[in-house]
Amino acid sequence: DVCSSDLAKDFARELAQYCKAYNLDGVCFDDEYEGAYDPNNPALTEPSEEAAARLCYETKQAMPDKIVAVYALRRMYSSKATVVDGVTIKNWIDIVVGDYGRDPSQVPYGDLTSKECSGQSMEFVRGTGGDLQGQRLINQGSGWFMGFSPKPENYGNVFRRLSDVRTLYGSPLQAPTVFYKDNDATPYQYPDDLQ
């Protein structure tokens, strides 16, 4: 659920403090699993494209030097809400990440361009989204691609699917030397400690 207009500013300021404290690049909003709206909670408003846009706008206002990204699946990225308080979407969303099989760079909303949008999204555990298509992304002017959920035990497949990264960046993807297990902050050596 998305904060009401009054509390969106407070929530955005809190996010900004976390980004500062942990030296994060920014935030990515994803309303894929939003819960049922609770009209008895004064901190929440009925989910809408306008409320989502307000949250992104207030977040960018609270931390203009940080990235505000959205996962383009439900209300977080919509042609219905591209202006907040007279400020256009390009000023409060930095990156739009498409769902698997969807390409928001083909028809960006408001004054966003393909450069702010992912042209391809890949999910590594389930294998959805295909292999990276670097030349297609270059040709259509996409600024980003997204890879989600690489797991150390599946790195071989991840590297294979990302082999076209050379087309985008001029060099191959480098294998990691360290990985972390679920709920464990211990650095493990890759691939020696996979067992």
Please annotate each region the language model reported.
Residues V2-S4:
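Short, small-residue-biased leader/transition segments that mark boundaries at the very start
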Residues D6-K20, M76-I89, R126-I138:
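Short, acidic/polar
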Residues A12-C19, E49-K60, G134-Q135, F159-R166:
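Generic structural signal for well-ordered alpha-helices
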Residues A12-E46, M146:
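Active-site groove signature of glycoside hydrolases
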Residues D25-D30, I67-Y71, D94-D99, C117-Q120, ...:
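Structural recognition of the beta-strand scaffold that forms the well-ordered cores
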Residues Y33-G35, A72-M76, R102, K151:
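Active-site-proximal loop/turn and secondary-structure-junction residues that shape catalytic pockets
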Residues E49-V83, I93, V97-G98, S121-F124:
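Aromatic-lined carbohydrate-recognition surfaces of secreted/lumenal glycan-active proteins
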Residues D99-V107, G119-Q195:
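Substrate-binding cleft of secreted/luminal carbohydrate-active enzymes
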